[in-house]
Each structure stands twice: as C-alpha cells, then as structure tokens.
Amino acid sequence: MKTKNPFKTNTLQSVILCAVALGLLIGLVMTDSAFAQAAAPVVKEIVQSPAKAVLTPNSNIADQDKHKRYYTIPNFRLGGKYNLDAPPDTWRNGGEGGTTLESLGSGPLQVAYIAVGTPKRNAKGEIINGFIISTFYSGDSTWMYNTWYTKQPANAFSGGEIVGPGLAIDTNKYYVVFLDAIGLWGASKPSHGLGRKFPHYSYMDMVVANCRLLRDHLNIAQVEVATGVSMGATQTWIWGVMYSPSGYVKAIMPIGGTTASDGADPVGQWTFRLGTAAIESDPNWRATNGNYYHLPKGNHPNQGMQFMWSTLQLTGYTFPVRSATPWKTLQREVFYWEPKGEETATWIGRVKNEDAVDYWYRNNAGFNYNINNELKRIKARTLVVHVTNDLWLMVENARKAAAAVPGAAFATLSDPQAHYGVFRAPNVLKDTIKAFIDNTFTASLPGIGGASGGGGGGTAPAKPAGLSK
C-alpha cells in the first residue's frame, strides 16, 4: 500500500515510521542475469499451490513475485516430533507422528525461494557454497530480497545494500538462497484452503522442509553460512542444532532471534499471546470459531488482525521514538474498533493481503518452542547478533544462548528501531559480520563482547576456538 509521507525525509524518525506505514511493499525487477547465475537441477515449478484456491498472495512484495520459485514435497509430515539423536535422513519426511497435507485432501507441501549468486560445484555437480537467509515472522523471500539485495527500493530500511557482488554477503563467492517459511506467503499455509484443519506446524518443520528444498531441488551439498533476522534467526538456531553436527551447515549467524519462546521467555510469550488474543477478540472470529473462509473477505476477522498489529507495534520500536511522534501520526497505527479518518489506516491497508488463521498458526508455532537444552549440539562456527534495546526478544536471553554454544561469539548493537534494528545489523556491524562470513573473524571487532558473549574484546582470544570449527 502507498501512503503520503507526513515526515521530513532527513531524519531517522521519518525513516522508521514511514517504513512501517509504507510496509515496504514497493519492489523493483531483478535482472535476468542474476538468475542465469543461479543454475539448479531442472524440475517442474508451480505458480500457485496445487488444487486449492489462494486467499492470500504468494509474495509479500508483489513486484518481486516473478522471481520467486516453488518446490513441492510429497507426504511431508507437519507437527510431528523430531528425534535429534537420529541421523538427519530420518527427518526427510518431517517429524514422527505428524500429519501430511495429502491426508487432509490438499496437495503436497509447497516451499518457495529466490536464489541469486554464483554456484560453486564439486566433481559430482553439487553446489558447495550455499548461503541461506531464512525469513522473519511476517515476511518472505521477496521482502528480504527487496530489502537486502543490491539496488532495491527498500535498501534504506537496512541502512544500505547487504547482498550482492562485493558486499557483506558476496554473490561472487556464494550461492545465496532467500527462503520462505511454512505458514505464510509462497509456502503452504492455512489460507491455501484448509484453514483450521491445517496441521499445527513447528519451526523445525520449516527448517527440515527447506533443507529438502536445498538438497533435493537445488542440489546444495554444503551450506557455508545460515543466517536470518528475527524469526529467521530463530530458524538459524535450528539449522545449527539439526544440521551442523553432520557438517552440512558450517556456520550460523542468528540476528535478533530466540532459542525459546515458551514460558522461558516471558516477555516474548506475553507479547505474542496478546497478538493471538487480539485475533480471537474479533466478532467475526468469535462467531465462526475461526472457520470463516466461506465468507467474503470483508467478513473475515480483519479487525482482529489490525488489533494484533497495533499491540505488537507499540513495542516494535523504542519508546522515545514513539513518544517523539505526533499523536495524529501515531493514530494511523493505533487500533480503533470504529476508526474515523486516518485512525488505524496503516493496519486497515496491510491486512487486506493477510489472513487471521495464518497468523494464529504462526503465533502458535512459537508458544511451545524451546531448544535451550539442544544448543550443545551445535558444531558450526557461531556468531550471535542481537539488538540491546529489543523490546520483544530480550538481549540477555540471546547472551545466555550464545554462552551455551562452545566457542560462540556474541555481538550487539543499539538501534532506535529496537527490534527492527535487526535488518540494519549487517551494515551497522559490517566489518564484524563480513569477517565472520569470510572466516577472518577476530574478537576485537566492533560489537563483540568476546567468546560466548562474555568478557571484553581486548581480553578475548584473537580468534575464539569455536570460530575455527
């Protein structure tokens, strides 16, 4: 959606608030040459999910949709349990006891991605320089591409370009894959038609399904680095737990994620419980118990979604930023059951392309998530990055998680955008992050608190042991 920019453009505050108002939904077209570099095995690709009507778009950024590619995985089990002591091949089809979409009358599980960069292959023709970027809570590959990839319209939100030739994530060196996640946009989701019959998926399901995409579809035999921001960082932690012991993933760099969002993280749990409660407070949800797909879009729980976004965004940015913003401007983001004029306008526009059941499931995936006891399994080089003034995911939890991984390094930054500072982190800590990616890391780089997040940069070893893995 497009809204009139009410701010001066030369202040940080205007960048922050206008980015939210705009939703960063303006895209440019990626050149064909970028995909010409991204060679992959030839498979049949699909445009939309099979057999089911799509109630929500396949891409967050419509203008980038043409670059998204799809892959289907038959008989993948969602919502099952994973035995982490078993070999990864035992997870190929999801967790034990899970439910397949086919058993519910749907088509097979769908995953989606955008790939750029330069594949390097071994003698078998397998790609051995994979670099994966998992998506965040409400995003997808088009959003991350539109924000991080070189010469895109939303680069300013992340403080400049991050992915491209010669950049921190160098497409001359790596074959970079932006990934969607099960539950929203181009991946299988409740709004493909199953609604509340859709299986309750987990973050582990997201990672295992995307690993199938990498191995079976893109023929990637080695992931050099896995990263992502927010929920993308949460998935990055899981990539480390599940796929670094075998050596498939060599390095992980979670930026602003969490290793637990159950009761072990009271603030995070509280924050997103409020979001779910907001959805469930909508009269249309209550009248249908969330089974409303037979109704016109105007009769869906759209106000519940607006309410959810309003509750989340209160703490999405620092309170000084919010307090310094005129009330008339903030009213666009404040929820009203009976809005007048510009009240709630930001969220009224946004939720036209979103679905309440999709987000109800997305929240639910986090409520029972906790891998704190599994962090010792990580064998990858590890750099944990976190925003110190994040009001959703507390920095101390990230510090403790880093300390649980032998040899991990911990880097921090402060940002007026609070949690949203995760998108800028690779530019704010450019030297640190590029050095980690290129495996030339030292503990005296900007933002580093030392190995495992403890101590000062001056007393830490030149290269923490874990970073030599």
Please place each PLM-identified region on the residue numbering:
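Conserved alpha/beta-hydrolase "acid-adjacent" motif
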Residues: 391-397
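Catalytic-loop region of hydrolases
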Residues: 37-130, 445-451
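Catalytic histidine-centered segment of alpha/beta-hydrolase-like enzymes
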Residues: 416-427
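Alpha/beta-hydrolase-fold enzymes
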Residues: 248-349
